[in-house]
Swiss-Prot record:
InterPro entries, alphabetized: Trimer_LpxA-like_sf
Name this polypeptide is given: Shematrin-like protein 3
Taxonomic path: Eukaryota, Metazoa, Spiralia, Lophotrochozoa, Mollusca
GO cellular component, one term: extracellular region
UniProt keyword annotation of tRNA processing present: no
Species whose genome carries this gene: Pinctada maxima
Keyword check for Signal: yes
Organ and tissue specificity: Prismatic layer of shell (at protein level).
Domain of life the protein comes from: Eukaryota
Amino acid sequence: MLKLVCAVVLIATVNAKGSSPGFGIGQLPGITVVSGGVSGGSLSGGVSGGSLSGGIYGGYPRLYGGFGPGGVYGSINSFGGVNTNAYGLYGTSPAVRGAAQGAAATSVLGILSGVPSRISGYSVGTGGGRAFVSGSATPIGGLPYGGYGYGGYGYGGYGGYGYGGYGYPDIAYYGGSTYGNIASGVISSPTSGVSLPYGGILGLYGGYGGYGSGYGGYGMGSAYSIGNYLSGHGGYYGGSYPSYGSTLTGVSQSLSFGRAIMSGQAFGAGVPAFGSVNFGNFGVGTGGIGILGGGGVIGSGGVIGGGGVIGGGGVVGGGAVIGGGGVIGGGVPTGGIIRKKKY
C-alpha cells in the first residue's frame, strides 16, 4: 500500500513600502500553494504580476520563476517537519527573512485548521546570518494564542545584526489572519524600520490514491505539518551567486481546539543551509484535520491509533510491540515461541 506523501510548494511574496509597477495589485503580493500529482503536472500563469511554472514529479516540487522583489517557498507533508526557503529579499536582515518564512508557514497551519485563524509570530537574529523563528495559528473566537511566549527567550541574549556597528538586536514580527484559503498580514522590524505587507490566496490540491482535491485543507491527506523535502537552492539562488536567501528548518505541532504552533531556525544572509532536516514522526498524523480522529494527535498515523504509538503498527497494536505480529500477540512470544506441552 502506498503511503501518502503530499508535497506542497509555497510562495509568499512581499513588497516593501508602497507598490511597484508589475509587482502585484496595490501592496498585496501573492501566496500560492500547489500540491499533489503522481507525476507530471504543472502550473503556469500570473499571480499578482508574477508567474510560476514547473512540474511536480512523484510528489516532489520543482519550482522555477518568481514574484516581484522576493518570495518564500517550501513543502508540506505528513512528517511534522518545517522546511521553507526565501530568496530575493534583498537588503533585509536574517530576522526579516525568517519572519517572512514563518508567516507563510504559519498561514498554512491556519488554513489547514479549516476555520478563520489569527497568525502571530516573531523572528530574532542569532548572529552569523541565522535567526530563531516561532509562531502560532489560532482559530478566531476568544481562544488564547498558542505558542511559546515572547518573554521566555530574552531578546537581549541574542546577538544583534549589527546595524551601524551598534549591534542592536535583529528582531522582526509578523501578524495577520487567514479566512477560507486567503492569507494576509504584515511583517515588521523595529530594528531596521522595515514594513512588508503580504497576502494572497492559498490553493490546496489533492494527494495520492483517491484522496481527491481539497479546499482549505480538507481531504488533503496531511495534517498540521510543514514538510521537509525540498530540492535545490539551500541559501543560494541561480547556482553560484548569493541572493541573500535563507532556509527555515524546524517542527510544527498541533494543539487542542484547532491551534497549531511552529518553531525553527532560519539560515540566511548568503550563508548556505546545512542540509535538509527531517523531523519525522513528530506526533502529527497523516490524514484529516481534527485533533481526535484520523490524522490528528489521536488517530491513524497519530500518536495513538493505527500507525501511531498505540495502534496498528505502533507500540501497542497489530504489527507492534503488543498485537499481531509484535512482541506480544500473534507474532513471536505468543503463538510463536510458546508451545503447548504434548502429553
